[in-house]
A protein has these predicted regions:
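Short alpha-helix plus adjacent loop in nuclease-associated cores
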Residues: 18, 72-86, 143-173, 229-231, ...
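Conserved RNase H-like, two-metal-ion catalytic cores of nucleic-acid enzymes
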Residues: 5-6, 16-55, 71-72, 76-83, ...
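Extended two-metal-dependent nuclease catalytic cores across DNA- and RNA-processing enzymes
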Residues: 2-3, 22-26, 75-253
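Conserved "right-hand" nucleotidyltransferase catalytic core of DNA-directed polymerases
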Residues: 235-391, 487-678, 691, 697, ...
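C-terminal polymerase-core module
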Residues: 560-567, 571-623, 790-838, 842, ...
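Active-site palm subdomain of RNA-directed nucleic acid polymerases
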Residues: 516-528, 532, 852, 856-877, ...
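Conserved catalytic core of nucleic-acid polymerases
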Residues: 484-485, 541, 597, 639, ...
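Function-dense linear segments that define catalytic or interfacial modules
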Residues: 380-383, 412, 416, 450-481, ...
């Protein structure tokens, strides 16, 4: 059997991969999609070909012999996109790490190097596969040289294969004649001129008949159509030059030895160096290809399990005065890597369940919440002192907690502190013996502040980013097993996993602290985010009462209206169909009923909300469909969905997330209470199902127009500041100024439009976006925005300054120092850059508002406790705080909310709040 060589056109495949795969970046901000796509294509080819030799050719950015012949050669090509250009050296680094031979030489294109190597290898009896997205290489095809052209699609990579026979079948010319076709028709991508007036069809017909441009010229008077004859006579010299430009040099002056490209087996590419680079680039899906293990960290040799009380006592005593990292290993019900990156469950969703053994009866001071058992405690206080203290009958959780509380370490670092506070018994107390808020450090929150645009912060990423360590992930070690199952089935891997959690916390605390200080976010971390961990933990523990009966009643009312709408829609359509099927709905609306503006896609007509919103005012069936969608969403998500989250204590215990949004806003999951509808009355009615406990009321405080007030302060615009200081209706004031009409004559519509402009400006709205919101022309919207900036000139200067600063620094900051990186600003894609500019304008405003709300939450939470009140902060939704208030404490709680929320930040305008009380959340709002 003949030996086989695979040749890859480096730049071509990188370029194809970059367009086939959406932009990806790793935590360093490096664009990686082209490299990732290239590797997937290469692995696919190698698995299919199983070659004996492998070589990748790259272009060199200097003129070739073709440029000397024709200065305009490739002159019309756009420069390589910055995102792709950045990845070329990364690609070469990866290939070298794999031991792949790379060829490149000044004066030649990669095509010439590939052609030369392919022909030499064919002559030596080697079968050749050339992989490229460039069809120019089809001229190389023979019975022994196969051209493979990959197409990257969402469903995977498809490859077209061409030997000489396939070229002839598809293009009606031989591979060598393919050059002549290109010489006649030209090539706009390479700026090869060709012959004017001769396109692909005519060129193919001429060459198929005469075999070459030279022979065609001999028979020039016979050429059809006559225009081709005339033009070839006139431009024959250009045709010959075009042929030279299009011809791949198969005798390039390169020193290439086939033996140097030898590949014993494909698995030889999966080197340790390449593995580490894949880890760095965060190609998690590719790591499974590597049989190599992650390089062993020397700390692993010192991972140890402690089972005896005496040994545990000695170990905890040794922590005194040292910096340590720890991790409380929870009893998990399930492990979902997507929702809990570090594998911790939401402990508050089932806090009312009784515990067994010696923990039974131990209660938190604030309520009926028992301190739960845990599997054990991992602690690291040095490179050689990393232990997992396992809980058992001989060494119960109570004893471990007691020893840990008295350890008197200098500092305690951990990953994702909030879920561990319950096991430590630190809810509402903020301390456990010698462990307190002051000496605790949450590495996950620190990593989030330093790079808030990541999706998750698993321990292996934190280790890599802040300690330069490449370590095995939880998934690598124990797959999808819970900790309890892993301890039973994979004890060694389990020990590594939990010890790494503690070790990474210990190892990365100092570099994280240094980076926080260097970036000016130390105060943000210490004074806002760390106290918030305790605030949120207490709120999760408290939860909020949800009436299953009220939710059912609400759902039943929705069901009646949904049934009415369904019948009405069928009647209007003249037939029954699946209203929830976009395909069927599109056919009904745009074919049967012939509604205008139907946008047909590959899967059918678009029935997206923006399409239907424009039709609803004129077509009752569309208005009914929109209402139907709204009500079915309310029923499934809230009326039916929320019931599943009611715990045994009758409360819903949502999980608040501190490390999800790039702006610093909080989010919540299981369930998401941030999205409780507010715009429509039917949505607001859901709040009736949320109740205070007996003898209590809800007191709700909501910041009024906080983002606009922040904008007034940050921009320093005197008119906006004056309007707020005079307690004017800001939207009516804006309408009066923008539309040049007296304040008292502003109509409701004008006020509504001004409100859309006011809030739109905060989010960097474009004239197109505003035109869509207000159903006006783009020109009118642009005029509104222009007049707005004329009215408030300093706002325009401020927003422009934010964009300029972001372009220079790569990030923007809030009033409290929170950073928001904006990689989109360096994109070559206009839409991405425009999106980046909107982020630059909005993030400092939205982020500052988020910081203020967090400060207010901490202050309200702490003051309720400090004053010994029974009332508790239980929920936050955007700019709103909800306190479950003892009836006799209502006035005091109102006072606390007003003082602490007003005082959360000192702005040039007052932070106003609206405070209401009620017997359910609806009434309180």
């Amino acid at each position: 059997m003949s030996e086989k060589l695979v040749l890859i056109d480096g730049h071509s495949i990188l370029n194809r991969a970059s367009f086939g795969i959406p932009d990806l970046t790793n935590s360093e901000g490096l664009h990686t999609n082209a490299v990732y796509g290239f590797l997937n294509i290469m692995f696919k080819i190698l698995e299919e070909e199983q070659p004996d030799y492998l070589t990748v050719a790259f272009d060199v950015s200097e003129p070739t012999f073709r440029h000397k012949m024709f200065a305009e050669y490739k002159g019309t090509r756009k420069p390589m996109a910055a995102e792709l250009k950045q990845q070329v050296p990364l690609m070469k680094e990866m290939l070298r790490a794999m031991g792949v031979t790379i060829v490149e030489k000044g004066g030649y294109e990669a095509d010439d190097l590939l052609g030369t190597i392919a022909k030499r290898s064919e002559a030596a009896g080697v079968e050749v596969a050339v992989v490229s997205g460039d069809r120019d290489l089809l001229q190389l095809a023979t019975d022994h040289i196969k051209i493979r052209i990959p197409k990257t699609k969402r469903t995977g990579t498809e490859i077209e294969d061409y030997n000489a026979k396939e070229v002839l079948e598809k293009y009606q010319v031989t591979p060598t004649e393919f050059i002549d076709v290109k010489a006649l028709m030209g090539d706009t991508s390479d700026n090869i001129p060709g012959v004017p007036g001769i396109g692909e069809k005519t060129a193919t017909a001429i060459i198929a008949k005469y075999g070459s441009i030279e022979n065609a010229y001999v028979h020039v008077d016979e050429l059809k159509p006559p225009r081709a004859s005339t033009n070839l006579k006139e431009h024959y010299d250009m045709a010959q030059m075009s042929k030279t430009l299009a011809t791949i040099d198969i005798d390039a002056d390169i020193a290439y030895k086939l033996a140097d490209a030898h590949l014993e087996q494909v698995s030889d590419l999966y080197t340790e160096e390449a593995y580490l680079l894949c880890k760095r680039l965060e190609f998690k899906n590719l790591l499974g290809r590597f049989s190599v293990e992650a390089p062993k960290n020397t700390a692993e040799e010192h991972f140890k399990k402690i089972e005896k009380a005496q040994e545990a006592e000695a170990f905890f005593a040794s922590l005194r005065g040292k910096a340590c990292g720890f991790y409380v290993v929870p009893q998990e019900e399930t492990h979902d890597a997507h929702t809990e990156a570090d594998g911790q469950m939401n402990l508050f969703g089932s806090f009312a369940m009784q515990n067994s053994g010696e923990e039974a009866g131990q209660q938190e001071t604030a309520g009926s919440c028992h301190i739960p058992d845990f599997l054990g405690l991992a602690v690291a206080c040095g490179e050689e002192e990393i232990c997992y203290v396992e809980a058992s009958e001989a060494l119960p959780c109570r004893k471990i907690r007691e020893l840990f509380a008295g350890s008197a370490a200098a500092s305690y670092a951990t990953l994702d502190l909030k879920p561990q506070l319950k096991e430590l018994g630190m809810l509402e107390k903020k301390c456990l013996g010698t462990i307190s808020e002051e000496n605790l450090f949450d590495n996950t929150i620190a990593a989030y502040l330093l790079n808030p645009i990541k999706n998750e912060y698993p321990y292996e990423d934190i280790a890599k980013d802040y300690a330069g360590l490449m370590i095995s992930s939880r998934k690598d070690l124990i797959e999808k097993l819970t900790y309890e199952k892993a301890a039973e089935k994979k004890p060694e891997e389990f020990l590594k996993c939990v010890c790494y959690m503690a070790y990474v916390a210990y190892k990365t605390r100092e570099p994280l602290e240094k980076e926080l200080a260097d970036t000016g976010m130390e105060a943000l971390f210490r004074e806002i985010e760390m106290p918030l961990v305790f605030t949120l933990a207490d709120m999760e523990k408290e939860g909020i009462i949800a009436s299953g009966e009220a939710l059912k009643e609400y759902g039943d009312k929705l069901a009646v209206r949904i049934d009415e709408l369904e019948r009405k829609i069928y009647e209007e359509a003249g037939e029954e169909f699946n209203i929830n099927s976009p395909k069927q709905l599109g056919v009904i609306l745009f074919e049967k009923l012939s509604l205008p503006n139907g946008k047909k896609t590959k899967t059918g007509y678009s029935t997206a909300a923006d399409v239907l919103d424009r039709l609803a005012p004129d077509y009752p069936i569309v208005a009914d469909i929109l209402e139907y969608r709204q009500l079915t969403k309310l029923k499934s998500t809230y009326a039916d969905g929320l019931v599943n989250y009611i715990a045994e204590d009758g409360r819903i215990h949502t999980s608040f997330n501190q490390t999800i949004t790039a702006t610093g806003r909080l989010s919540s999951t299981e369930p998401n209470l941030q999205n409780i509808p507010m715009r429509i009355e039917l949505g607001r009615l859901i709040r009736k199902a949320f109740l205070p406990k007996s003898g209590f009321v809800f007191v709700d405080a909501d910041y009024s127009q906080i983002e606009l007030r922040v904008l007034a302060h940050l921009s320093g615009d005197e008119k906006l500041i004056e309007a707020y200081r005079n307690a004017q209706d800001i939207h009516r004031t804006t309408a009066s100024q923008v539309f040049h009409i007296p304040f008292d004559e502003v109509t409701d519509l004008q006020r509504r439009n001004a409100k859309a402009v006011n809030f739109g400006i905060v989010y960097g709205i474009s004239s197109f976006g505003l035109s869509q919101d207000l159903s006006i022309t783009k020109k009118e919207a642009a005029e509104y925005i222009e007049r707005y900036f004329e009215t408030y000139p300093k706002i325009k200067g401020y927003l422009d300054g934010l964009v300029a600063e972001a372009k220079e620094k790569g990030y923007v900051t809030t009033m409290f120092g929170r950073r928001r990186p904006i990689p989109e600003l360096s994109s070559s894609n206009f839409m991405q850059r425009s999106f980046g500019e909107r982020i630059a304008m909005n993030s400092p405003i939205q982020g500052t508002a988020a910081d203020i709300i967090k400060i207010a939450m901490n202050r309200v939470h702490d003051r309720l406790l400090a004053e010994g009140l029974k009332s508790r902060l239980i929920l936050t939704v955007h700019d709103e705080l909800l306190v479950e208030t003892a009836a006799e404490e209502e006035q005091e709680v109102r006072k606390i909310l007003a003082e602490e929320m007003h005082g959360a930040a000192q702005l040039s305008v007052m932070l106003e709040i609206d405070v209401h009380a009620g017997s359910d959340w609806y009434q309180a709002k």
